[in-house]
């Protein structure tokens, strides 16, 4: 049955993706320009022969912003590689299909390992993968979108360590690492629920065995080794460097009425599906086991966290403000409530359906979910029909990127606009103290001998060069951010520099024409972390092969 169900999941994936791709356009809203610029930088660096990307030399207005150092991007490589064989729009939708099918497949096998039921796993995968909130994330919010792929595997790992087979600790290590490589904030959100589950374990089991504690610590330790390349830059380049990050604040919460009523509408967005809302209203009537009551409680609590009735004001000044948008908890609400929906509905169906009827039912469920998803995506398609194309603007424009339509012929127009959300993330705080400073970076303005110069950058991978002519020896303040491992050369010779009041590179020049090149050279510790991480993944793979062989005996 696995092949049948995976085939049906692939069918729904392709149908929904082709429905979007047939528009031959993309709606650039929310975080789209931030992530699209990162993918463009990776693609252009790959094209020039550089595999690693550290700073934004070609995008982000050539400011050298280091969002690549502090925001994981490994899962964007498939999108970047697809750019070599497909047009920009088609490359995105091909990547979108890959992510969707990966979500469906991991969801299916995670639920199969938990429930041991194929039909329940199929229903879970369908409802979870094509949930309205996940469809919304797939339009632009790609950090969360990628993290959602691995949440079912992550909570399967937590279950195995705390209640199931503790020898499967590796599931938690692997899934935790994959979430970290997708979206750091999702690691924090997942830890919240992991702590709740740990407390529930202590209460319901009146403690926890030493073996389970060992498995928990082992999975955490291995996970750290697996994600060292994500962790190390924070220690080598972020801590103590006066850099900014995404602004911590709770900027939006929903009312219960909004969540309830909005969930019964067809379109994608910040909501649950009507199926999950019905699960909330009816699940209590058929839940029998303590385990399912716990899952139900977690689903309700996740919904509660999205609303303004949770005392979010009390979190001011705490790490919990990193959540920013409480709608992020909808991914967790969808996960827990979909487990109940899948278990309950599959039990009822399997009592009355066998043989060929089961095949017909499975196909019908796939068609229903495909139609439901197409209905959810129809508003997006309608938007693409009526919104205007993104117009051209100057290369150093300070105008925020508008919510407009992108096609292959105007795809590159977006990179000349100021990125709407995240343009100044991970820059020195000193560069953000005024709009004038921010705009001076976007407009490539340098300061020399009391004069303002507008310079044109010469770009290579992780490297920005400027031609600067000075009438006398003087310091030049370039529109490129200075980090701990920034490198500077003048006329081909390594040169000392300091950080200016904009957080930018300031370097002393001799009289005459000078070529100043600003680059980034990662710490040797970073490359060591990559080696350790790769060896850890290989060691874990060898362990799994031996473990499976021993387990099979």
Where would I find each of the regions flagged by the language model?
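Perimembrane helix-loop-helix junctions
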Residues: 190-220
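Hydrophobic, aromatic-rich transmembrane alpha-helices
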Residues: 225, 272-296, 300-301
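Active-site lumenal/periplasmic loops and adjacent helix-entry segments of GT-C-fold
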Residues: 15-114, 119-152
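Start-transfer (signal-anchor) and selected internal transmembrane alpha helices
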Residues: 1-18, 540-553
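Active-site-proximal, structured, solvent-exposed surfaces of multi-pass membrane proteins
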Residues: 429-553
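Membrane-interface alpha helices of multi-pass inner-membrane proteins
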Residues: 157, 169-184, 219-225
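Membrane-interface transmembrane helices that cradle and orient dolichyl/undecaprenyl
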Residues: 154-168
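Hydrophobic alpha-helical membrane-interfacial segments at the cytosolic entry of transmembrane helices
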Residues: 8-9, 208-232, 294-301, 367
């Amino acid at each position: 049955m696995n092949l049948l169900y995976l085939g049906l999941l692939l069918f729904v994936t392709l149908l929904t993706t082709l429905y979007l791709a047939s528009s031959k356009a993309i709606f650039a809203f929310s975080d789209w320009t931030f992530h699209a610029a990162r993918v463009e930088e990776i693609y252009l660096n790959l094209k020039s022969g550089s595999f690693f990307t550290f700073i934004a030399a070609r995008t982000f207005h050539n400011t050298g912003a280091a969002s690549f150092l502090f925001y994981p991007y490994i899962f964007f490589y498939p999108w970047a590689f697809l750019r070599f064989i497909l047009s920009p729009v088609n490359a995105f939708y091909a990547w979108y299909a890959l992510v969707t099918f990966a979500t469906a497949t991991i969801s299916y096998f995670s639920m199969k390992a938990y429930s041991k039921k194929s039909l329940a796993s199929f229903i879970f995968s369908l409802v979870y993968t094509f949930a309205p909130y996940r469809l919304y994330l797939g339009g632009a919010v790609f950090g969360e979108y990628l993290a959602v792929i691995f949440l079912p595997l992550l909570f399967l790992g937590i279950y195995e360590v705390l209640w199931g087979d503790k020898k499967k600790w590796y599931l938690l290590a692997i899934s935790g690492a994959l979430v970290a490589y997708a979206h750091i904030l999702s690691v924090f959100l997942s830890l919240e629920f992991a702590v709740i589950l740990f407390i529930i374990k202590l209460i319901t089991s009146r403690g926890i065995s030493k073996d389970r504690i060992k498995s928990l610590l082992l999975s955490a330790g291995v996970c750290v080794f697996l994600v060292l390349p994500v962790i190390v830059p924070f220690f080598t380049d972020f801590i103590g460097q006066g850099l900014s990050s995404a602004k911590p604040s709770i900027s939006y919460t929903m009312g219960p009425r909004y969540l309830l009523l909005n969930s019964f509408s067809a379109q994608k967005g910040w909501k649950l599906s009507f199926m999950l809302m019905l699960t909330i209203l009816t699940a209590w009537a058929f839940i029998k086991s303590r385990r399912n009551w716990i899952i139900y409680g977690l689903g309700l609590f996740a919904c509660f966290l999205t609303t303004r009735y949770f005392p979010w004001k009390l979190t001011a000044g705490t790490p919990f403000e990193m959540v920013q948008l409480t709608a992020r908890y909808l991914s967790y609400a969808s996960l827990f409530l979909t487990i109940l929906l899948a278990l309950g509905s599959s039990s009822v169906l399997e009592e009355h359906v066998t043989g060929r009827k089961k095949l017909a039912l499975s196909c019908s469920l796939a068609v229903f979910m495909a139609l439901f998803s197409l209905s959810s995506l129809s508003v997006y398609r309608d938007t693409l029909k009526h919104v205007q194309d993104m117009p051209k603007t100057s290369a150093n424009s300070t105008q925020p990127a508008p919510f407009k339509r992108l096609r292959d012929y105007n795809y590159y127009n977006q990179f000349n606009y100021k990125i709407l959300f995240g343009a100044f993330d991970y820059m020195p705080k000193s560069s953000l103290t005024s709009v004038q400073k921010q705009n001076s970076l976007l407009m490539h303005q340098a300061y020399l001998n009391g004069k303002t110069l507008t310079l044109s950058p010469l770009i290579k991978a992780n490297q920005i060069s400027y031609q600067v002519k000075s009438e006398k020896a003087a310091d030049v303040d370039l529109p490129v951010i200075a980090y701990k491992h920034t490198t500077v050369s003048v006329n081909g010779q390594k040169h000392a520099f300091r950080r200016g009041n904009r957080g930018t590179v300031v370097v002393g020049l001799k009289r005459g024409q000078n070529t100043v090149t600003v680059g980034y050279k990662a710490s040797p510790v970073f490359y060591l972390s990559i080696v350790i991480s790769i060896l850890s993944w290989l060691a874990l793979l060898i362990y799994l092969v031996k473990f499976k062989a021993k387990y099979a005996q």
